Regions:
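A conserved active-site cap/scaffold subdomain adjacent to cofactor or substrate pockets
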Residues: 1-23
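C-terminal charged capping/lid subdomain of soluble metabolic enzymes
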Residues: 25-167
Length: 167
């Protein structure tokens, strides 16, 4: 079996790359009305979760995601709050996060895995974990914010594009 630490290394790299792509966008220009209009109702989200997980894992993911799911007007308020504080948040995140390529280099120098292939996975395998990571815990993350903003699919595509982290 794969070492938990090795999986965490690869997952951390993927999330750092996702954060970089997210932080390159101008959240302050988000069309909140369009994001709210495009927001799926809970039954559609549940169908998506159940198509991502099987059995008891699906039940767990549904329960966890329902905790953080926002109805349209709640979503409008949440997005507005995030946008209002975005410059401070963006500045803090930019200071705290290590660039993905720098972290990959640090891992390599330490003899740790820095590419999915180092632990017998592919970039496609790692990509497939993104919705699972978003749905499996009730904690609100950048993946959730990206989904609410309508950017999730585009950002995942950018992370795993030909000029992405693992090319």
């Amino acid at each position: 079996p794969l070492s938990h630490g090795h999986k965490v290394a690869i997952g951390t790299l993927a999330m750092l790359a996702f954060y970089e792509k997210f932080l390159n966008r101008d959240l302050s220009s988000l069309d909140v009305d369009a994001a709210v209009a495009a927001w799926p109702q809970w039954p559609a989200v549940e169908v998506n979760i159940r198509s991502t997980f099987d059995g008891a894992l699906a039940d767990h993911a549904v329960a966890e995601t329902q905790v953080k799911y926002a109805e349209p007007e709640e979503l409008r308020a949440r997005l507005t709050r995030v946008i209002d504080g975005w410059e401070d948040t963006r500045t803090a995140l930019t200071r705290q996060l290590v660039p993905a390529r720098d972290f990959a280099d640090q891992l390599r120098r330490a003899g740790a895995p820095s590419r999915p292939e180092d632990i017998g996975l592919t970039a496609a395998d790692v990509r497939a974990t993104f919705p699972k990571a978003m749905y499996y815990r009730s904690r609100y993350t950048v993946l959730d914010l990206a989904r609410e903003a309508g950017w999730y699919d585009e950002l995942v595509n950018e992370v795993f594009s030909l000029d992405g982290l693992w090319t």
